[in-house]
Amino acid sequence: MGDAGSERSKAPSLPPRCPCGFWGSSKTMNLCSKCFADFQKKQPDDDSTPSTSNSQSDLFSEETTSDNNNTSVTTPTLSPSQQSLPTELNVTSPSEEECGPCTDTAHVSLITPTKRSCGADSQSESEASPVKRPRLVENPERPEESGRSKQKSRRRCFQCQTKLELVQQELGSCRCGYVFCMLHRLPEQHDCTFDHMGRGREEAIMKMVKLDRKVGRSCQRIGEGCS
């Protein structure tokens, strides 16, 4: 009687639940019938996928090993050329550094005499210019003066030998030293040898107003001079 009471007092054990929410059984790996059927269908696919993944991993490993081998083979061929480049640069760099100041000094030595020669030429031109100007003015006058004879009488025109009155003698006298009539008194009419334009420039320069150096530099208030 006691055993029967104890069995009755025990609660019946509940079956396990499937992840989907239904009741499962120990025979079906604690899954319901539907989930167990789906699980069985997926088993062959799961078995095939690891095999393919393993094959892909094997191929990838083979490719990586081949790449590593290629790099290991090519690296020693490149290393000598890479090492030779810095040596060539190191060899050429001092030559350029040494030639730099040499070229600078050469340029300086070539430029300095040209500057001196230009200065000497400018000085020689400046010294010769004032000497040449009067020569150019005097040279055309000398042959004409030597070719022209002196005027014997100032009462007659040197060009046409017409008689002149006293007023005509004063009006017809030219700066070249000859006397002409009213028809030949202008410089263009008797081929005058005197440089009237140069003379006019000199007179204009002499008549120019020379400004004092103090103008515009000293300031003075209005009324200071008167006080």
UniProtKB/Swiss-Prot annotation:
* Superkingdom assignment: Eukaryota
Q: Which residues bind Zn(2+) 3?
A: 174, 176, 190, 192
This protein's record includes keyword Metal-binding: yes
| Segments forming AN1-type zinc fingers | 151-200
Q: Name one Pfam family in it.
A: zf-A20
* Zinc finger boundaries on the chain: A20-type: 12-44
Region Disordered, annotated ranges = 41-151
List residues binding Zn(2+) 2. 157, 160, 181, 184
Entry keyword set = Metal-binding, Zinc, Zinc-finger
Provide the GO MF annotations for this entry.
DNA binding; zinc ion binding
- The leader peptide range reads none
Q: Where is the composition biased (Low complexity)?
A: 49-59, 66-77
Q: Output compositional bias ranges, type Basic and acidic residues.
A: 135-148
The residue ranges flagged as biased composition, category Polar residues, are 78-94, 111-127
The residues the record assigns to binding Zn(2+) 1 are 18, 20, 32, 35
| Keyword Cytoplasm included in the entry's annotation | no
Q: Which PANTHER family match?
A: AN1-TYPE ZINC FINGER PROTEIN (PTHR10634), AN1-TYPE ZINC FINGER PROTEIN 3 (PTHR10634:SF67)
Protein's UniProt name: AN1-type zinc finger protein 3
Lineage of origin: Eukaryota, Metazoa, Chordata, Craniata, Vertebrata
The UniProt gene name for this protein comes to Zfand3
